[in-house]
Amino acid sequence: MEDRAGQQERPSLRLEKLQHWARHRQSGRLLVLAVSQLWLAVAVVPFAVSVACLNSACHMTTALPLGPGILGLLTGIVTLELRRAPRLWKLAGLLVLELSAEAFTLGGVLVSAYSLFLLSQRKPRCCRSQSLRYQELQEGLSELEEVPELETGPTVASTAKRTNQ
């Protein structure tokens, strides 16, 4: 009798394990989707900062890559919250989230490519104030090179030592 009870217990244990696996399989897909979106957001923000460093005068170029990064971050957070939602919301929300995640990823790539295109097409006089400051620094450096006192400085010091001797 105990053998029969043990045999009946085993299938129910297997069934329970399969049900547990089926419940968490969808949750695992959501977790992978959330992590990929969070990584996209983390990767896009430094790109936006580097674009800003290349051309600080054009704010549009700086703001373009930040949009997909922020949207990817929000999608990742919503996806993590969706893992705790009831099953009905998971089924409908999963499809919407997968499509929106793909759209955000594609949007991030397109916007980043467009911002690089804008950087490559910028005119040389786009940042005129920066180039003027650079020219002023160059002129100041050339004035320092022309000062003859730097060459006579050590000789004056050496003659002062001779007079003391």
Curated annotation (Swiss-Prot):
Stretches of the chain forming a coiled coil according to its record: none
Keyword Methyltransferase: no
Start-end of Polar residues biased regions: 155-165
Main location group: membrane
TM spans (from-to): 31-51, 60-80, 91-111
Keywords per UniProt: Membrane, Transmembrane, Transmembrane helix
Cellular localization per UniProt: Membrane
One cellular component (GO) term of this entry: membrane
Protein name as catalogued: Transmembrane protein 253
Organism: Bos taurus
Biological classification of the source: Eukaryota, Metazoa, Chordata, Craniata, Vertebrata
Gene coding for it: TMEM253
